A protein has these predicted regions:
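C-terminal recognition in membrane/secretory proteostasis and scaffolding
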Residues: 1-280
Length: 280
């Protein structure tokens, strides 16, 4: 009888020389040593196939699957480094491998890991260069729509303008801040977890929070600011207004539904952060 093992598959595509390679290996199914050995194996394979040092862009797609993960879990992200591309792209993979192997809820067995890597020395980077409001006004109405014109400049190429609509919160008062940034830059933290107001209690919740983590290829536009204390016709705030127990997946889903937050996927690594303040 064979000992339990974790299966790894690496699909590596070097765009510059138009060469695709597939490698497979296995590690012992040990929750503590397995991820370390697996990450070292991944690093060795990619380092050998890339066979270069220095700058580059990588598009990664990883998939974790197993007996009690029937649909698996996938994530796609893009990485850019001016000095050490391989080291940069495997940092997130190491973290995810540990989370899946060491999660406190249940063992995923048999566990399989697939990693698709597409690399190039080209700098697939876009910079957020300018943020303007179309048809700018002195004041804005709560619940009103605002058109944002965002100037983006790909590395050493001509700039382009992307228009993104955003909605002022219905209970906004005073001044609101509009923020446009690259995914992962100043990403909101899990405040309810840090404050001890909530805990992740099952694997489904853990996967849900992992799935909403921003990726480096996203443009994030959001608006926030002071809000009226009146809520649902009440003159006084509820305890929920003072202590928000929601997880980030719940908060983000509501903000996206209301139009207060917009995520746009690109094929670039997005750099930059710009702000504007408007009067309500």
């Amino acid at each position: 009888r064979l000992a339990p093992a974790v299966s790894y598959k690496v699909k590596f595509n070097d765009v510059d020389i138009n060469k695709e390679t597939v490698k497979r290996f296995q590690t012992p199914a040990d929750s503590f040593t397995g991820p370390v050995i697996g990450s070292m194996g991944m690093l060795g394979i990619i380092d050998d196939l890339w066979a270069r040092r220095g700058e580059g862009t990588a598009i990664l797609k990883y998939r974790f699957y197993g007996g009690n993960l029937p649909n698996g879990w996938e994530r796609r992200n893009i990485f850019f480094s001016e000095k050490d591309l391989i080291g940069s792209l495997l940092t997130e993979f190491d973290t995810l491998s540990e989370i899946f192997s060491l999660n406190q809820f249940q063992e995923i067995r048999p566990l399989g890991v697939e990693l698709d890597v597409e690399v190039t020395r080209d700098a697939r980077v876009v910079f957020i260069e300018k943020l303007e409001i179309a048809n700018k006004k002195d004041t804005y109405e709560p619940g009103g729509k605002i058109e944002l014109d965002i100037t983006l400049r790909p590395w050493r190429k001509r700039s382009m303008v992307k228009r993104i609509p955003i909605t002022v919160p219905k209970n906004a008062v005073g001044f609101c801040e509009i923020l446009v940034r690259g995914g992962g830059i100043m990403e909101p933290e899990q405040e309810s977890l840090a404050a001890g107001l909530r805990a992740i209690s099952n694997l489904d919740d853990l996967l849900k929070e992992l799935s909403i983590k921003e990726t480096n290829n996203q443009i994030v536009a959001e608006i926030d600011g002071p809000k009226s204390m009146e809520k649902d016709g009440k003159d006084k705030p509820n305890i929920e207004d003072l202590f928000d127990e929601r997880l980030q997946s719940e908060i983000r889903a509501e903000r996206i539904k209301k139009g207060e937050m917009v995520l746009v996927d690109t094929n670039y690594y997005v750099e930059g952060l710009l702000r504007k303040v408007i009067k309500i």
